[in-house]
C-alpha cells in the first residue's frame, strides 16, 4: 500500500506535482488545499478570510487533516497539502517538500489566480504567517523544520516538467527499493 505525501509552500508546485505523480503511479490524489478551499466556499469566505477563521476555530484544520490521515491509513494514495506530510508521516512511504523563493511563488500564484504580483505576495506572506502560528498552536509542528522529509526540492528555477521528473525519479527509486518491485 503506497502512500506518497507532497507538502510545500504556497506556489511551490505541490499540487501540480502531486497530480502528475498520482497519474503516473495510477493512484488517486487527495489535496488538503482543495478540501480547505471547499470548506472556505461552504462557509462563504475567500481563502485568506478562511485562514483567519481557521486560526480561531481549530476544528477546521482537524477536519482537513483527519481526511488526509484516513486516506493515508487506507493506503494507495498521493496526498498533497501544506501540512500533510507532518500529519501522515507514520504512514507515508515517501515525503517530499517543495519550496521556492517568495518572489517566484508570488509570480506563480499571480498567474494562477489572475491577481497582481503584489496581491499574491501579500497573500502568501499572510497565509504563511497564519499557517505557521496555527500549526504550532494546534499540533506543535514547526513548519520550518523539514527534517521529516525524504526530499526537499527548491523549484525556484526548475520547470514544472523538471520538478515532476526529479520528484518521480526519487519516488520511484524509493518505492522500488522499499518494495523490491518496479512501481514506475
From Swiss-Prot:
<keyword id="KW-0067">ATP-binding</keyword>
<keyword id="KW-0418">Kinase</keyword>
<keyword id="KW-0808">Transferase</keyword>
<dbReference type="InterPro" id="IPR011994">
    <property type="entry name" value="Cytidylate_kinase_dom"/>
</dbReference>
<dbReference type="GO" id="GO:0036430">
    <property type="term" value="F:CMP kinase activity"/>
</dbReference>
<dbReference type="GO" id="GO:0036431">
    <property type="term" value="F:dCMP kinase activity"/>
</dbReference>
<comment type="similarity">
    <text>Belongs to the cytidylate kinase family. Type 2 subfamily.</text>
</comment>
<dbReference type="InterPro" id="IPR027417">
    <property type="entry name" value="P-loop_NTPase"/>
</dbReference>
<keyword id="KW-0547">Nucleotide-binding</keyword>
<dbReference type="Pfam" id="PF13189">
    <property type="entry name" value="Cytidylate_kin2"/>
</dbReference>
<dbReference type="GO" id="GO:0005524">
    <property type="term" value="F:ATP binding"/>
</dbReference>
<dbReference type="InterPro" id="IPR011892">
    <property type="entry name" value="Cyt_kin_arch"/>
</dbReference>
<protein>
    <recommendedName>
        <fullName>Cytidylate kinase</fullName>
        <ecNumber>2.7.4.25</ecNumber>
    </recommendedName>
</protein>
<dbReference type="GO" id="GO:0005737">
    <property type="term" value="C:cytoplasm"/>
</dbReference>
<dbReference type="GO" id="GO:0006220">
    <property type="term" value="P:pyrimidine nucleotide metabolic process"/>
</dbReference>
<keyword id="KW-0963">Cytoplasm</keyword>
<feature type="binding site">
    <location>
        <begin position="8"/>
        <end position="16"/>
    </location>
    <ligand>
        <name>ATP</name>
    </ligand>
</feature>
Amino acid at each position: 500500500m503506497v502512500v506518497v505525501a507532497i507538502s510545500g509552500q504556497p506556489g511551490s508546485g505541490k499540487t501540480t506535482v502531486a497530480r502528475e505523480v498520482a497519474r503516473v503511479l495510477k493512484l488517486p490524489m487527495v489535496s488538503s488545499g482543495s478540501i480547505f478551499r471547499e470548506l472556505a466556499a461552504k462557509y462563504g469566505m475567500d481563502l485568506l478570510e478562511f485562514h483567519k477563521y481557521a486560526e480561531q476555530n481549530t476544528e477546521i484544520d482537524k477536519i482537513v487533516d483527519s481526511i488526509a490521515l484516513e486516506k493515508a491509513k487506507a493506503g494507495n494514495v498521493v496526498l498533497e497539502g501544506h501540512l500533510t506530510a507532518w500529519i501522515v508521516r507514520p504512514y507515508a512511504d515517501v515525503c517530499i517538500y517543495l519550496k521556492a523563493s517568495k518572489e517566484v511563488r508570488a509570480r506563480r500564484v499571480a498567474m494562477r489566480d489572475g491577481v497582481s504580483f503584489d496581491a499574491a505576495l501579500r497573500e502568501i506572506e499572510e497565509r504563511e504567517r497564519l499557517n505557521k502560528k496555527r500549526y504550532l498552536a494546534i499540533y506543535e509542528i514547526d513548519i520550518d523544520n523539514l527534517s521529516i522529509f525524504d526530499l526537499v526540492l527548491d523549484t525556484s528555477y526548475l520547470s514544472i516538467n523538471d520538478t515532476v521528473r526529479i520528484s518521480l525519479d526519487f519516488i520511484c527509486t524509493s518505492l522500488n527499493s522499499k518494495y523490491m518491485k518496479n512501481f514506475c
